[in-house]
Curated annotation (Swiss-Prot):
Belongs to the Caudovirales dATP/dGTP diphosphohydrolase family. It holds the Pfam family dGTP_diPhyd_N. It catalyses: dGTP + H2O = dGMP + diphosphate + H(+); dATP + H2O = dAMP + diphosphate + H(+). Keywords: Cobalt, Hydrolase, Metal-binding, Nucleotide-binding, Zinc, Zinc-finger. This is dATP/dGTP diphosphohydrolase. Residues 103-141 are annotated as: Disordered. InterPro entries: dATP/dGTP_diPOhydrolase_N, dATP/dGTP_dipphydrolase_MazZ, Znf_C2H2_type. Its cofactor is Co(2+). Transmembrane segments: none annotated. It comes from Salmonella phage PMBT28. A zinc finger (C2H2-type) spans 262-285. Catalyzes the hydrolysis of dGTP into dGMP, which is needed among other for the first step of biosynthesis of dZTP (2-amino-2'-deoxyadenosine-5'-triphosphate).
């Protein structure tokens, strides 16, 4: 028996790469988290065209992935084109294309989904509104607690690199640190690469990074710091000596009364380097092993 189905006129969806569809869906999901559901329906065509052009420009510069989301610029551009397609078919009043002779100019305030009428002065600049707290909390990749960001990073890494190891992640971190150095510490994307790897390594090691940082900062707040000759800083202890190599410990048992009670005295000395400590020990104790 031969099956018959009339598909004439139907869209050949098999021509679309499903991975591209998934990438666009991820862009849309992040957009909803960042701006709210269907926020784009209040935008104007010209604004969306600007966004699409920016992503295409990044592709022309061989920058394939968006720094903020980590997703492909092609998927970002496609999502913007989809919005434009929908608005042109369903909300023709959104069509404010600058170079269309049939459309009067509409001035829109950036950062808002509603057009702002011109002031009486005509060309007066409109103030840019500060983002509301509720909106800022929805940002997916740039706000939240350290624990939130660590969870976000590890979730992505688990899906993308499920077989990664701590050693491999540390090796990658070293490479990213070199790239950050090459960029003269001016590239936000390189900073983000280093931070992402640090948080993922901590997650792989089972470290609650938020608690670890809080505990360490409590210690740092109590320390006194001094600048060293190489420009770095080291915390200072014991009346001004800097922490260096672990100290040599001396223990002495001193009698305190005729009954035989003793007082244990522990003394230590710190050294600036391992060679200094070894030299001091040899001078004091000869070849006897500690």
């Amino acid at each position: 028996m031969t099956g018959i189905k009339f598909d004439q006129g139907k869209a050949p969806l098999s021509l679309i790469d499903p991975r591209f569809t998934e990438e666009v869906a991820r862009v849309l999901a992040i957009g909803e988290q960042k701006y709210g559901r269907a926020n784009w329906q209040g935008l104007k065509i010209e604004r969306l065209l600007d966004a699409v052009k920016r992503h295409v420009l990044e592709l022309e510069k061989s920058n394939d992935h968006d720094d903020e989301t980590g997703l492909h610029h092609a998927a970002h551009a496609a999502s913007g084109l989809m919005f434009i397609f929908w608005l042109l078919n369903n909300r023709p009043t959104s069509d404010d294309r600058r170079w269309s002779a049939a459309v009067p100019g509409v001035r829109e305030q950036r950062g808002s989904v509603q057009p702002v009428p011109d002031s009486e002065e005509g060309l007066d600049m409109q103030p840019v509104p500060a983002p509301s707290p509720s909106r800022s909390k929805k940002r997916a990749y740039s706000t939240g607690t350290i624990a939130d960001v660590q969870k976000l990073i590890s979730g992505w890494a688990d899906r993308t690199f499920p077989d990664r190891t701590i050693g491999e992640a540390i090796l990658k971190l070293k490479k990213e640190l070199a790239e950050l150095d090459t960029a003269s510490y001016l590239d936000a994307g390189e900073f983000a690469d280093v931070a992402i790897l640090l948080l993922d390594i901590a997650q792989l090691a089972g470290i609650d990074i938020a608690t670890a940082v809080a505990n360490k900062m409590a210690i740092n707040e109590r320390r006194v710091w001094q600048r060293l000759e190489d420009g770095t800083h080291q915390h200072v202890i014991d009346g001004g000596r800097t922490d260096g190599v672990d100290p040599i410990i001396r223990v002495a048992m001193l009698p305190t009364d005729p009954t035989g009670s003793h007082l244990c005295v522990v003394c230590g000395q710190r050294f600036g380097s391992e060679d200094d400590r070894a030299s001091h020990y040899t001078t004091t104790h000869g070849d006897r092993k500690p």
